Amino acid sequence: MNPRPLIGITMGDPVGIGPEIILTALAGTSVYEKCRPLVIGDPGVLGQAMAVAGYAPVIHMTDTPETGVYRPGTISMFSPAPPLSPVTWGEPTPETGGAMEAWITTAVDMAMAGAISAMVTCPINKEALKMAGSAFAGHTEMLAMRTGTNRYAMMLAGNRLRVVLVTIHTALQNVPGLLSVDAIADTILLTVESLKQRFGMNAPRVAVAGLNPHAGEGGLFGDEEARLITPAIEAARRKTEAAITGPWPPDTVFVKAAAGDFDAVVCMYHDQGLIPFKLLHFEDGVNTTLGLPIIRTSVDHGTAYDIAGTGRADCRSLTAAIDMAIDQAACLGKRPAA
């Protein structure tokens, strides 16, 4: 058995920075020393990005992950969609949107079949998905549907802060109506389970943020803390011995978490968690989907059309996502036999 896990890396939006950061992340030897990276995407687009990235490896096309060539200076690729190149950086089309979805579903199917240990995704463009007629708003929903998963959550993780979201992509005005005792408690428990199983923590410490200023200030600024969040915390505590505390005032809980007091913070809505997270981990943060039967990590940034094709893209988030996928594969014992 090859000791290095096989990691499928989807190219993401082919007219964004995905192709460039793949090239720069795979330049050198460090990634190859830890895993076998298989790029799922368009070889012509990757070739087009070589002039931008300043790195021109050999592209090895493979029909299966097992027959790839995994050594520095060579990038093994699998291409399940019609050729795209040449593309125009920063200009999505229905064809680029369709290719993105094909690459993602292929990686999911490979992971579900055990052909790869984990999948790592580069950023996609939701507008291009819509142009292609996709029914999905983004990665998380697509992965959940493809794997038949109803219970899932988004975690953003770095070495100083981890946040998990109860609600994800929805208008702020809709958040209070989407919160429930069951939804909050389930997110808390999923966070605890994932910290144990995928991050190797025996006794995780989870903080739960309030929704309102000062966590409601005893009902002066809202009743969601008393009506929903506190009962959810109590319900979660009945099902686990992990340390679950809260509801914490949102303006202070992240300070304590960044200081090492908590292993993760459960947040009520998207920007509550992502603003503090990106202040600390804008360059090296990782998005990982909890609850899936497969391992999926991702960069925590977008397609960056404004710098696509300029050679200025930073690959640190992708490198961190690859490292996290490797670590999760080790924790879960997911490794192809090849």
UniProtKB/Swiss-Prot annotation:
Coiled coil residues, start to end: none
Cofactor: Zn(2+); Mg(2+); Co(2+)
Keyword field contains Magnesium: yes
Pathway participation: Cofactor biosynthesis; pyridoxine 5'-phosphate biosynthesis; pyridoxine 5'-phosphate from D-erythrose 4-phosphate: step 4/5
GO CC term (a single one): cytoplasm
A UniProt-annotated Pfam family: PdxA
SUPFAM superfamilies: Isocitrate/Isopropylmalate dehydrogenase-like (SSF53659)
Catalysed transformations (reactions): 4-(phosphooxy)-L-threonine + NAD(+) = 3-amino-2-oxopropyl phosphate + CO2 + NADH
UniProt-annotated binding residues for a divalent metal cation: 169, 214, 270
Family recorded in the similarity comment: Belongs to the PdxA family.
Protein name: 4-hydroxythreonine-4-phosphate dehydrogenase
Organism of this sequence: Desulfosudis oleivorans (strain DSM 6200 / JCM 39069 / Hxd3) (Desulfococcus oleovorans)
Gene for this chain: pdxA
